[in-house]
């Protein structure tokens, strides 16, 4: 019996980060909209719920009352590992199927995962960077903070793969870390000026999410194109 002939209504939830135009998650949201349009004739509706990808509490606020309504399946962006595991276990108890997007989490019962292997992506980033640097060059690792200091599951895995590759290949430079803000260029320029002035041997930089443009804009403004930069996601601002 086909879904189209059935009178049963199916309700799916998609829990993903909010975004502004041109960001990585905009493309994900557009894909969900396309799926919703295609599945409408099969009595399937999709409700999109958004959280702040830099604030774990906003994710927890969404899922707190998630099961108070009828839900037949859930798509989960897996940025916050502990919270996603708690949600997954609750869905398991209620026999509600779910899938992951962005990064995978082992030991759960997701039907599928859609995304890249984050750890391997970190290894590839390190390899690309070190192909262009000497083993004694210093590297800047940047992370973006917002309302709280939560690293995404994907970012953690990428960072782990990146550092493991450096360790295994005899890297003997120094790693420098800096925390930047998503919408505060004055603060970011100040922090980056400080760290580059104090560490003139920094010849490479990496950021483990889709905000590579923040570092790229700084390096361009300061005339530091000789610093090799690696980032992720072919969104418009990262390729300009």
Segments from the language model and where they lie:
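An alpha-beta-alpha
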Residues: 125-169
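Short helix-capping segments at alpha-helix termini
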Residues: 38-42, 94, 166-173, 199, ...
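Amphipathic helical "hinge" segments at domain boundaries
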Residues: 6-61
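Basic, Lys/Arg-rich alpha-helical nucleic-acid-recognition elements, primarily the DNA-binding modules
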Residues: 1-2
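Flexible loop/hinge segments that line or gate small-molecule binding clefts
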Residues: 83-120, 235-240
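Hydrophobic alpha-helical segments within soluble ligand-binding/sensing domains
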Residues: 113-139, 188-189, 236-240
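Short beta-strand elements in bilobed, periplasmic/extracellular small-molecule ligand-binding domains
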Residues: 36-56, 140-141, 163-186
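Hydrophobic alpha-helical
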Residues: 74-92, 162, 178-237
